[in-house]
């Protein structure tokens, strides 16, 4: 009986990890679409995963920011960066998705 409980626990954890990796991959793909498209982030920022070589904003491969900090800047703008949330360019879900992407350095 203990073996069955162990196997069941293992399978639950294994399946959960697979589901999370698919969710992460889907979120990353959606983030890339926003980064290179609607958000126009690639025009100003460097991000290897997006194939972007912008030279106006910071290189996102080199900044060390929290998710909340990135989300705040994308929403409200900073310096020459426009407020993509306040001007209606991106909705809340799109801001969270592109903010997540900007933290992934692959």
Task: Indicate residue ranges for each PLM-predicted region.
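Electrostatic cytochrome c docking/interface patches
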Residues: 17-36, 69
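The canonical Cys-X-X-Cys-His
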Residues: 31, 38-47, 98
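Gly/Gly-Pro-rich "capping" loops immediately C-terminal to redox-active cysteine motifs
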Residues: 42-75, 80, 86
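Conserved small/polar residues in nucleotide/adenosyl-binding loops
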Residues: 104-106
